[in-house]
Regions:
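Active-site-adjacent structural elements in enzyme catalytic cores
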Residues: 1-211
Length: 211
């Protein structure tokens, strides 16, 4: 049976955030709010927790997970970021974007896309997600909470509790959220490519390349 925390969506209670992070550190799988609906999260290094997430969502081998980072400095430890990519991300984070980048040696090989060695990276603006990442002190392995048979991210924490309370360790109630996914941008080449349109503005901005 999972725990169920009511955390204030704008001013997260430090006591509950600390308890949530301790669950993650001990190998737990949590449901938590992001800018684009609820997500499943666990420690990067915990293969067992990752496999539990795969079973919950019935994901195939090689599913592309995302690393949730607290800021660009942390993101740059886990992905190769050139000047063009840095300027674009600086102008659009934190926010509703997932960036595809080449992973560094800090990323476990099992998490990298097999052929291109890429990984999805996000810097969320949701206050609860940010508080979790700040307290954890490292990125969190994450994937949108889309249950089998659904094309939408789960948005109602009470419904999530009814369906998942026996298979996850913690569900964080952070309010009712939207169901649109993030906008996915491939930054592995010289020109950014939008791979998926989502809640992030399609006309994302980059700084003047001459800067």
């Amino acid at each position: 049976m999972s725990q169920f925390f009511y955390i204030h969506p704008d001013n997260p209670q430090a006591r509950l955030i600390n308890q949530a992070v301790e669950i993650v550190r001990k190998g737990g799988v949590i449901v938590y709010p992001t800018d684009s609906g609820y997500a499943l999260g666990c420690k990067i290094e915990d293969k067992g927790a990752m496999e539990r997430i795969c079973r919950i969502r019935q994901l195939p081998d090689g599913h592309n997970f995302t690393l949730m980072c607290r800021d660009l400095s942390e993101l740059s430890t886990y992905a190769f970021v050139d000047n063009v990519a840095f300027r674009l991300m600086k102008n659009n984070t934190p926010g509703n974007y997932t960036f595809i980048l080449k992973g560094t040696k800090e990323v476990p090989r099992r998490l990298l896309q097999e052929k291109r060695k890429t990984i999805g990276m996000r810097v969320p603006s949701n206050p609860i997600a940010q508080a979790l990442l700040e307290t954890l002190g490292e990125p969190m392995l994450s994937t949108s909470l889309m249950l089998p048979g659904s094309d939408f991210t789960e948005s109602d924490p009470e419904e999530i509790k009814d369906r998942l309370e026996k298979v996850v360790d913690l569900i964080i109630h952070g309010g009712f959220l939207g169901q649109q996914p993030t906008t996915v941008i491939d930054l592995t080449e010289d020109t950014p490519v939008v791979l998926r349109e989502g809640v992030g503005d399609r006309t994302f901005t980059a700084a003047d390349p001459a800067c």
